[in-house]
Amino acid sequence: MSTSTQNIPWYRHLNRAQWRAFSAAWLGYLLDGFDFVLIALVLTEVQSEFGLTTVQAASLISAAFISRWFGGLLLGAMGDRYGRRLAMVSSIILFSVGTLACGFAPGYTTMFIARLVIGMGMAGEYGSSATYVIESWPKHLRNKASGFLISGFSVGAVVAAQVYSQVVPVWGWRALFFIGILPIIFALWLRKNIPEAEDWKEKHAGKAPVRTMVDILYRGEHRIINILMTFAAAAALWFCFAGNLQNAAIVAGLGLLCAVIFISFMVQSSGKRWPTGVMLMLVVLFAFLYSWPIQALLPTYLKTELAYDPHTVANVLFFSGFGAAVGCCVGGFLGDWLGTRKAYVCSLLASQILIIPVFAIGGTNVWVLGLLLFFQQMLGQGIAGILPKLIGGYFDTDQRAAGLGFTYNVGALGGALAPILGALIAQRLDLGTALASLSFSLTFVVILLIGLDMPSRVQRWLRPEALRTHDAIDDKPFSGAVPLGSGKGAFVKTKS
């Protein structure tokens, strides 16, 4: 940017079309957040009506994560081939239909399947919306684009909590899911009223269709074995998270099978850059493991251990969700100022100071608890708003939606494991101690993975000839692309 351009307020760098694109995607992501968290709010009511164990009830949260990897792959490939807009609209329709089905579910199995559908739609919405907005905004504002967009999910969670307190005590838990059908109307409006992402249009103008991840995996020479592996992964995840399999050794074996399948898919689709993709999946896995025990089981903790009524639960969840939403926006500013990775590490380190007090204070002072949760979620959860920007920077435009969608949503299986892990630990400890311990310890793993830029570093160790030295979204250098101790002069930009 020139000096004169730097003196202009950041929001003046955006034209009306870019703001409209952002607003539409943000509302879509708000509705995604609204639909997705409904099950966490009514988990105790559903558990009571269906007669479920704690682990079975937690598996209803996990179910949406089981299908996310395939939704991210399929809808991401749609975004790479046909445009980000169509993928975003299709995703909204998919998770809305799943939410409506939850309201009609007669029992555990039906609701579990409906949650699988929600997971696919949610995965597609994440990848398509994030790439859509990031590719529509100027390069120097793309951390803000990412952070502002992801704040919509937290706002949706806040809205859902407030609606829960008004609807469920009067009409019951099923009525909450019937409201979730409204996003379909919004999706139909989106299809006609928003432009396509600029980066995608420029990349595809006058060119033949790209070879997407779906083409590589399911239309290539290994398509039969890949289809079989897809069914094997789906079956393995079902047995792991449906709540019926109690043998830890079998669960571990099935988990290892899934890991091998996902790594195989990454190697086939990414070629020589597979180490980067595998490490990104690991980053996201631990990001979910540290954050989702709190996200998923906080309502249960408030209702059971602190004995809060629905109105008080809604108020506390407002502080939590609003803090995460504010944190996404703050993270966007920090990312554009400090750089994506440095902002991420600094925010997580600050959040560690607050995680123990949140669960040590008890339920005697609701307002102090709410304030602590606000700042802890602002720093610990909100910074994940720039995670799409961080991941997307490792992929070229013509593979970004599927690359981001698949990588993120395979790692998001940590979100499926997290509430079950929290519930299992809570059988030996109280739930608050279990949640605090998981979050505090696993956050440090994420700090190391991102702070040391392990995706670039492992790529340099294993396949240096395919190393990307600069971020594909904002052109900033990757710190892990050069050995520790090397100066800035060691960076030589590689061709995509």
From Swiss-Prot:
Gene that produces this protein: nanT
Catalytic activity: N-acetylneuraminate(in) + H(+)(in) = N-acetylneuraminate(out) + H(+)(out)
Free-text function comment from the UniProt entry: Catalyzes the proton-dependent transport of sialic acid.
Disulfide bonds: none
Family affiliation: Belongs to the major facilitator superfamily. Sialate:H(+) symporter (SHS) (TC 2.A.1.12) family.
Membrane topology of the entry: Multi-pass membrane protein
GO molecular function: carboxylic acid transmembrane transporter activity; sialic acid:proton symporter activity
Listed GO CC annotations: plasma membrane
Superkingdom of origin organism: Bacteria
Major site of localization recorded for this protein: membrane
The entry's keywords: Cell inner membrane, Cell membrane, Membrane, Sugar transport, Transmembrane, Transmembrane helix, Transport
Subcellular localization, as worded in the UniProt entry: Cell inner membrane
Pfam families documented for this protein: MFS_1 (PF07690)
Name listed for the protein in its UniProt record: Sialic acid transporter NanT
Transmembrane segments: 22-42, 58-78, 86-106, 116-136, 148-168, 170-190, 224-244, 247-267, 278-298, 313-333, 353-373, 374-394, 406-426, 431-451
InterPro entries documented for this protein: MFS, MFS_dom, MFS_trans_sf, SA_transporter
NCBIfam families named among the record's database cross-references: 2A0112, PRK03893.1
